[in-house]
């Protein structure tokens, strides 16, 4: 009886990304391997390219085709957009007895890991399916999509370039993850969660949260001083009333005003991302709102 070899331990239907060769490819396997163990929880979108140069007509940059794998991923899975660019070189070992039909497995060498904010991606030639990649060191690559990829893959890259240039109208909504560039921590108005925020490291709190926390402490101090002053004033008024029994004058004591809206209301939504314009949250910048809440009307 013949034996079937090479079956994986678990067989599952591959997704459309796997069939197109853009998900779970060689680059993804490399960075998720124990050797690197990078971005293990993030999906890698990758494609194979040929490095080319332009001398009248597009041609391979080297005598032997320079094959590269270009991919993007996210340093944190919850990010709405990728923020990491990956580049790897692909080579095939050529032994003295190797032929075109007996080539060994390709060798993948990770060459660059760059933040996408330091990289410029551009669709340079749509008909030839060529990308232009410029790094922060002014190194420019012209990469032609490998012929094994269908046209749909290049459409994915066109869409990716447009999204990276214009952005998306969404942000991550996970309150457990602190991103100073896209989130204001969502905290409730209960005093029990104030200690939780103060226990967070300073690097995870943004400037707005720190400013509001300091303002809240100052507001509590001012309110406590006002209450003490009012208590002593009431005691003094009661003593004067008992001493002077002949006078019938009525006096109205002054009451210290305090803002009814808690300072934590500003942290329920981002100052630049109001989900409902009818909600009674701070609409003015933090600097102008703090003065009203601290000093009262």
Curated annotation (Swiss-Prot):
Name used for this protein in its record: Golgi-associated RAB2 interactor protein 1A
Its biological purpose: RAB2B effector protein required for accurate acrosome formation and normal male fertility.
Cellular component GO terms held in the UniProt record: Golgi apparatus
Annotated stretches, region: Disordered: 226-257
Effect of gene knockout: Mutant male fertility is significantly impaired compared with that of the controls. Spermatozoa from mutant mice showed abnormal head shapes with an abnormal acrosome morphology.
GO biological process, alphabetically ordered: acrosome assembly
Major site of localization recorded for this protein: Golgi
UniProt record similarity statement: Belongs to the GARIN family.
This protein's UniProt keywords: Golgi apparatus
Subunit structure as annotated in this protein's UniProt entry: Interacts (via N-terminus) with RAB2B (in GTP-bound form).
Family annotation (InterPro entries): GARIL-like_Rab2B-bd
Ranges annotated as biased composition (Polar residues): 240-257
Tissue distribution of the protein: Expressed in testis (at protein level).
């Amino acid at each position: 009886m013949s034996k079937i070899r090479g079956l994986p331990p678990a067989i599952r239907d591959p997704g459309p990304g796997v069939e197109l060769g853009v998900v779970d490819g060689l680059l993804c396997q490399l960075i998720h391997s124990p050797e690197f163990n990078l971005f293990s929880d993030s999906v890698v979108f990758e494609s194979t390219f040929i490095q080319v140069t332009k001398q009248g007509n597009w041609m391979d940059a080297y005598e032997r085709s320079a094959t590269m794998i270009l991919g993007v991923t996210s340093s944190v899975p919850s990010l709405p957009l990728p923020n990491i660019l990956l580049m790897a070189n692909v080579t095939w070992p050529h032994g003295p007895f190797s032929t075109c039909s007996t080539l060994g497995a390709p060798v993948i060498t990770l060459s660059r890991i760059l933040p996408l904010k330091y990289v410029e991606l551009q669709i340079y030639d749509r008909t030839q399916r060529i990308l232009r990649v410029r790094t922060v060191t002014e190194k420019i690559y012209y990469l032609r999509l490998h012929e094994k990829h269908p046209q749909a893959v290049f459409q994915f890259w066109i869409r990716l370039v447009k999204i990276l240039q214009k952005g998306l109208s969404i942000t991550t909504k996970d309150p457990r993850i602190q991103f100073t560039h896209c989130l204001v921590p969502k905290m409730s108005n209960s005093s029990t969660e104030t200690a939780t925020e103060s226990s967070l490291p300073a690097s995870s709190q943004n400037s707005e949260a720190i400013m509001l926390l300091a303002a809240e402490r100052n507001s509590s101090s001012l309110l406590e001083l006002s209450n003490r002053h009012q208590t002593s004033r009431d005691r003094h008024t009661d003593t004067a009333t008992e001493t002077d029994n002949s006078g019938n004058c009525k006096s109205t004591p002054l009451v210290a005003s305090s803002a009814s809206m808690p300072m934590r209301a500003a942290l329920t939504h981002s100052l630049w991302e109001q989900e409902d314009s009818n909600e009674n949250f701070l609409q003015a910048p933090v600097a102008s709102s703090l003065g009203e809440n601290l000093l009262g009307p």
